[in-house]
Amino acid sequence: MNYFSKLSCSWRITLGYLLFMLILPILALLSRASQELFSNFWSIAMEPAAIYAYSITLSMALIASIVNGIFGIFIAWILVRYNFPGKRIVDAAIDLPFALPTSVAGLTLATVYSEKGWIGHFLQSLSIKVVFTKLGVGVAMIFVSFPFVVRTLQPVLQDIEKELEEAAWSLGASSWTTFWKVIFPSLIPSLLTGIALAFSRAVGEYGSVVIIASNIPFKDLTAPVLIFQKLEQYDYTGATVIGTVILSISLFILVGINIIQSLNQMYSK
């Protein structure tokens, strides 16, 4: 009797689902890319347009995840610690990027931030252009990845005992000192998780970016859009190679963050 036959039905279903929905697609991508490894993999992966697309994608995703990390802390704090009219509506609106099709999100952002839009008209007077620029790419990534940080921080903030803050206050600590010395250290693992999830979501964003950006090489073309352009040109090899590079970078960053989290939890005990 082999090991697989000893597994319970629930384990078999779980492993089967992960195999067909996650593992096999990744292996298929890597297998197809490996066919080009000894011929022109690196020449395709290191094309100037591809390198610039990587830099735009990763830099904008990093900025978006950091921005969401900063504002996510404050928003999660307000939603957990304060009661105010319309709180449930605000809390439900946090999940809007999850439910909204990315193409609709891109159209909405392009409308609002266009030169004649509500926000874009004001920014235009400050000589700031969002639509069809790298800034627009960043705005789209911030929008679609925003909920991850808030939703990962909320349960942690709810579990923090109010008595810890009161004890710090009784010892003369200010509210700001209490937050940084007492509350923030316990938020670090969840914050890193939320930022990592936001980063991963932003790196793979296509639907909203393709609408709000001009998608011109060496300007604001991102890697996911470049992959789709390759597919439109029937360049399946190029699309596979670029996709493999982005996948590898994302996995490397996620593994690194998980290692940092593990070390942080180990030393905090």
UniProtKB/Swiss-Prot annotation:
Keywords assigned: Chloroplast, Membrane, Plastid, Sulfate transport, Transmembrane, Transmembrane helix, Transport
Membrane topology: Multi-pass membrane protein
Domain of life: Eukaryota
InterPro entries (alphabetical): CysT_permease (IPR011865), MetI-like (IPR000515), MetI-like_sf (IPR035906), Sulph_transpt2 (IPR005667)
Pfam families attached to this UniProt entry: BPD_transp_1
ABC transmembrane type-1 domain span: 54-255
Annotated Gene3D superfamilies: MetI-like
One Gene Ontology cellular component annotation held by this UniProt entry: plasma membrane
Transmembrane segments: 10-30, 60-80, 92-112, 130-150, 179-199, 208-228, 240-260
Range of residues in the leader sequence: none
Keyword Transport: yes
CDD domains attached to this UniProt entry: TM_PBP2 (cd06261)
An annotated Gene Ontology molecular function: ABC-type sulfate transporter activity
Localization of this protein: Plastid, Chloroplast membrane
Free-text function comment from the UniProt entry: Part of the ABC transporter complex cysAWTP (TC 3.A.1.6.1) involved in sulfate/thiosulfate import. Probably responsible for the translocation of the substrate across the membrane.
Family under the similarity heading: Belongs to the binding-protein-dependent transport system permease family. CysTW subfamily.
Protein name: Probable sulfate transport system permease protein cysT
Lineage of the organism: Eukaryota, Viridiplantae, Streptophyta, Mesostigmatophyceae, Mesostigmatales
Gene behind this protein: cysT
